[in-house]
A protein has these predicted regions:
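C-terminal beta-strand-rich structural cap/linker in extracellular carbohydrate-active enzymes
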Residues: 387-408
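Aromatic-lined carbohydrate-binding/catalytic grooves of carbohydrate-active enzymes
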Residues: 72, 76-175
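N-terminal module-boundary/linker segments of secreted carbohydrate-active enzymes
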Residues: 25-66, 70
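Structural recognition of the beta-strand scaffold that forms the well-ordered cores
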Residues: 50-56, 85-92, 129-134, 164-169, ...
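Carbohydrate-binding surface patches
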Residues: 283-286, 291-293, 329-368, 399
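Bacterial N-terminal signal peptides
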Residues: 11-20
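Aromatic-lined carbohydrate-recognition surfaces of secreted/lumenal glycan-active proteins
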Residues: 128-144, 190-207
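Glycan-recognition surfaces
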Residues: 150-153, 197-295
């Protein structure tokens, strides 16, 4: 019996049970945009814009418990994060307890004495959605019970708990085939009848952008992010290094299926506020999931201003769903462009250097006629700059950005 047949049989059984680089100048050409996807042709019709929310790992690692998660949920509501669009609260690794005699997974009774269902109910009562973490191996990255061999059983449990989002990792998987392993969990989640977003976290090792769109809603394209500007640090990558690896994958992204350059580090203290604005702007330009990773209960005003910049969030959440790309680079200066619904363009001027730099985006780079008049809005200054022809530019701070919305 083939793996595909096994999955089909398992789905039927479960349904019965549940019954109840340096680049040259390049213009944006509308003919090169990736085709729009009908939700019915994607994995499950969910995540038609990039998911937004919070994940526990970047800030708390394994030091997570229900008291912390409830405090985060309360802070997301009171701070305005929920109103800004951040709706998922995802509990990452180390929530697990043991499996019972029947193999059913439970929560760590010390960390989550009230149980996961009660926690999910609390988040839902606050108008938020609940996400959880598991792994395609026998054990998670943190050494807790993984889902290998328990995919349908765990999916049933997650659905009964009220889970809305599953981050599915790739530690301790041995010789498993990644596409088959993720397809198995995808089938299990769909068979429950509950809408659960599937986040594929296999670090880009097996080219998930080639197959993830028919299985999940987002897929990690790189190893883990770290709160550094650039370079590799142990097994993790700095912000700019991840942006460079994620950028060429733009043709694979679209509504319901997103490239995921990993969670945000904004507010965790390793970068300057200028660098965090660059980080956030790049993620928005790349139509990346905006999953905050800071301590929600201890946000300073600068962090709030970055994460809740409604103009920049709107670029990320644009309904056209096109991932932006770099169209010009010269030394440390770059121009990125993202087509938006209604014919507008988001433009990001990036200065990777150590000194201020003058950078301009030309209408040719944007795929617009040179003499066309267009209104320009500065998305970080929240200021309309009037109508321009031919180009829009700025003097950009070291490691900084200028970001515009250009509407013909």
């Amino acid at each position: 019996m083939t793996m595909k047949t096994l999955r089909r049989v398992a789905m039927i059984v479960l349904a019965l049970l549940l019954c109840a680089p340096a680049i040259a100048q390049e213009a944006i050409d509308q003919n090169t945009l990736p085709p729009s996807r009908d939700p019915a042709r994607t994995a499950n019709g969910l995540a038609q814009t990039p998911p937004m929310g919070w994940n526990s790992w970047n800030r708390f690692n394994c030091k997570i418990d229900e008291k912390t998660v409830r405090a985060v949920a309360d802070a997301m509501v009171s701070s305005g994060m929920k109103a800004a669009g951040y709706t998922y609260v995802v509990v990452d690794d180390c929530w697990h307890g043991a499996r019972d005699k029947d193999g059913v997974i439970g929560a760590d009774p010390t960390r989550f004495p009230g149980g996961i269902r009660a926690l999910a109910d609390y988040l839902h009562s606050r108008g938020l959605k609940f996400g959880i973490y598991s792994d395609a191996g026998r054990k998670t990255c943190g050494g807790r019970p993984g889902s290998q061999g328990h995919e349908y059983q765990d999916a049933i449990t997650y659905a009964r708990w009220g889970v809305d989002y599953l981050k599915y990792d790739w530690c301790n998987t041995g010789t498993r085939n990644a596409e088959e392993a993720y397809a198995l969990m995808s089938d299990a989640l769909r068979a429950t009848g509950r809408d659960i977003v599937l986040s594929i976290c296999e670090w880009g090792n097996n080219r998930p952008w080639d197959w993830g769109g028919k299985i999940g809603n987002l897929w990690r394209t790189t190893g883990d992010i770290t709160d550094k500007w650039v370079g590799k640090h142990h097994y993790s990558w700095g912000v700019m290094s991840i942006a460079d690896m994620n950028e060429p994958l733009w043709p694979h992204a679209g509504p319901g299926h997103w490239n995921d350059p990993d969670m945000l580090e904004v507010g965790n203290g390793g970068l300057t506020d200028t660098e965090y604005r660059t980080h956030f702007s790049l993620w928005a330009m790349m139509a990346a999931p905006l999953i905050a990773g800071n301590d929600m209960a201890a946000m300073d005003e600068a962090t709030r201003a970055i994460l809740m910049n409604h103009d920049v969030v709107a670029v990320d959440q644009d309904r056209l769903g096109v991932q932006g790309r770099r169209v010009w680079k010269e030394g440390d200066r770059e121009v990125w462009v993202k087509p938006l619904a209604g014919g507008a363009r988001a433009v990001l001027l990036v200065n990777r250097g150590e000194a201020p730099a003058a950078i301009a985006a030309t209408w040719d780079q944007l795929g617009l006629p040179d003499r066309l008049g267009a209104s320009v809005r500065d998305l970080w200054a929240h200021r309309d700059l009037g109508r321009r022809r031919g180009s829009a530019g700025a003097t950009v701070a070291p490691h900084g950005v200028a970001m515009f919305r250009i509407q013909p």
